[in-house]
Amino acid sequence: MKMVPGIQELRNLVVVRAGQSSLHNGWLAGQNERTWDLLVSYYDADAFGNDTSGMPKFFCAGGKWDGLFRTLNEAVDLSRYDYVWLPDDDLEASTQTINRIFELARLHNLAVCQPALTLDSYFSHIHTLTCAGFKLRFANYVEIMAPCLRRDTLQQLLPYVSNSKSGFGLDDVWCRLQPDNHKSAAIFDDAPVRHTRPVGLHLKSVVQQSGLSQEYEGAVLKNSFGFLDRTRPVCYAGIDSRGMMVNGPQSTGLRMALSHLKTWNKPPKNQQIRKDFFRMLRRQLIGTVDFSQIHLLPLKENDRKPASLSRQADNE
């Protein structure tokens, strides 16, 4: 397999799908030595042509996940890496933070994980916001925004995203691919990143240009997995800042709620954040977590369209 020149084989790999406004150069700033290789996979031809940084780069038009499929198949030898981080290009992070992501992933042998988001980030799920007092929280849901995947998990999923620009649906299944999924996925409060732009604006437009929707892509992808349920995020355990284990979604959720209330000083006035907060607390207190293994369907069955959305696709 051809490797893009400049990759150093550090056992950890970061691949970012990048455009004109990508923030990946900031990830290299500072004095900390990197424990990871970086490959910039450009979806924007002008950004690719204007990049004179000397960093390893690859051009591939398209969305995030179909582009990652091509990049990882054509420009990377995955057998050289234990973990691969696949962040969006609008995340602010430091070399030290990214080093810590890989350190925690390897320390806990996680199948999939993600950094928490700083409290001033744009976010989709409030449980991904950083919680003071935790090093990490074990969760049943990791976002597609910035997942870090163990090689075997990535290799298992990669063939299924060859035609998916958004990757919608991955976040519902990749925390349940192991024979034992308890504590196989986590969110790292000890390694937060800042999400600087409203969620999914560029990717949504790319998907719409193809005549589909992110929701349709998600249904198709989950249908190819033989799994159509929706995962409701719950953090069911954690490790606090003293290194002590916190067990159970109720105990974890109460600590999460107290952390946010202390940070905000009082319940938030923003109605959407207030709604998100109480939804999170309700799920933590009464929600359930399914640790059963999802078995992916053979790829030959991957062409089936979900009947419930076939008409929707025809009308878009």
Predicted regions located by residue number:
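C-terminal catalytic/acceptor-binding lobe
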Residues: 13, 164, 168, 172-316
